[in-house]
A protein has these predicted regions:
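Alpha-helical transmembrane segments and their immediate juxtamembrane cytosolic regions
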Residues: 2-30, 37-403
Length: 403
């Protein structure tokens, strides 16, 4: 993962603010402020030679093989992201769809972010890693923020919708957040209690409505503990949750989560799972922000562990697709938003049980195709540009070239 995706290169988830998801858009300008095979959502810009991912060693040594477990995890997580987006318009008419939506949203982005943090452990301010952070995260963020804005102008008949690199729209928030988290990695590596500190910051953000929308800081700060958790993990921690006992325990845990989500669906504001707002903005008392942040952090960690427990560690047909999750993440958003803009959900049969099943299968199939090598080759110029022309050459490297 270290040199194989957004979380690996440097280390996702229609509509308006009221019903948006963890990757959903919000209106802009609101009053309160505002390498090859590297394209996976959790690996961009870091080189972690301990993780078993592809990273060239000095002297032209062979690259280590990618860890199939993490590629499988990223692929399955991106499938859940796409399915979650397809379920969103079904929630009002189907309590079951709402329960599935809530359950998935409780852990799919935390899982991505934990993996991103895990593959950021070796990140420092070395020149080559900063370059990968820029080309693997910052540049795709700029390109897709502009692309999504033009898409909204055209598809939503909103020709004056503004371009803003400080107010990410829809899916692009994750790239901006990852860029910020990755830059702060050296700080988290020197503090004594990084996870409690990150959790304190998240709690304070959840009770601070004046933070504003710029840089989507609420999400950056409220999701921060998951990234820091990833920085603190070691390979043995992943082995621990993949034991047979963990898989057995995960079954009643997931069943209980679904039952609770079914009960909570008509009673709970799903916006809590998006980590995009302070408690006061959700019409809740300020203290509930702290309570919900801590409670949801614990629940998300448990569900992420249960999710990891069922991830195969062997190479499978989908393992290679894990290197292309960034492509699936960013590209499927055009269809997810377009389906709303073009009123595809107005068709009655989609809101039937069989319609929901077919929609779920379609979402999984589409995002799978978007992760495939042909799509990666087609869009690599935007996702993984080399941009050697933009950086100064290393004097040592230049001397070697002359000799």
């Amino acid at each position: 993962m270290a040199d194989g995706s957004v979380a690996e290169r440097a280390a996702a988830p229609a509509g308006g603010r009221a019903s948006g998801s963890a990757s959903h858009a919000r209106p802009r300008g609101r009053a309160r402020g505002r390498g090859r095979g590297r394209g996976s959502l959790a690996n961009d810009g870091a080189v972690d030679t301990k993780a078993g991912t592809s990273a060239n060693t000095a002297g032209g040594a062979k690259a280590k093989p990618r860890d199939a477990f993490f590629d499988n995890a990223k692929y399955l997580a991106i499938v859940l992201v796409a399915m979650g987006h397809s379920w969103e318009p079904l929630r009002d008419g189907s309590r079951s769809a709402a329960a599935l939506y809530i359950t998935v949203y409780a852990f799919h982005m935390p899982a991505f972010i934990i993996i991103s943090g895990y593959f950021s452990r070796s990140f420092d301010m070395r020149k080559d890693r900063l370059q990968r952070l820029i080309t693997g995260v910052a540049v795709p963020y700029i390109l897709f923020e502009v692309a999504y804005t033009f898409f909204k102008r055209w598809a939503d008949d909103d020709p004056h919708y503004p371009i803003s690199l400080t107010d990410p729209w829809y899916l692009t928030w994750f790239l901006l957040a990852l860029f910020i988290w990755r830059l702060t990695t050296p700080l988290w590596k020197i503090v004594r209690w990084p996870v409690p500190l990150a959790l304190t910051i998240a709690v304070l953000a959840s009770i601070s409505p004046d933070i504003g929308d710029d840089l989507d800081l609420q999400r950056v700060l409220q999701f921060l503990p998951f990234f820091v958790i990833g920085l603190s993990l070691k390979p043995e921690h992943f082995k621990l949750v993949r034991r047979k006992k963990a898989r057995i325990v995960s079954v009643p845990v997931f069943a209980g989560a679904l039952v609770f989500a079914y009960w909570a669906a008509p009673r709970m504001n799903a916006a809590w799972f998006y980590h995009r707002d302070a408690a006061q903005e959700l019409a809740a008392p300020w203290w509930s922000g702290a309570v919900m942040t801590l409670a949801m952090f614990g629940c998300s960690l448990v569900l992420v562990a249960c999710f990891f427990a069922w991830i195969p560690g062997r190479t499978m047909w989908c393992t290679a697709l894990g290197a292309g999750t960034l492509y699936g993440y960013l590209l499927h958003g055009f269809l997810a938003k377009g389906s709303r803009f073009w009123n595809w959900y107005d068709v009655h049969w989609i809101h039937t049980p069989w319609g929901a099943v077919l929609l779920t299968l379609a979402a999984g199939t589409i995002v799978t195709l978007l992760c495939t090598p042909p799509v990666q080759r087609m869009f690599r110029w935007a996702m993984e540009p080399k941009m050697t022309w933009a950086f100064k050459k290393d004097p040592v490297g230049m001397a070697r070239e002359r000799t």
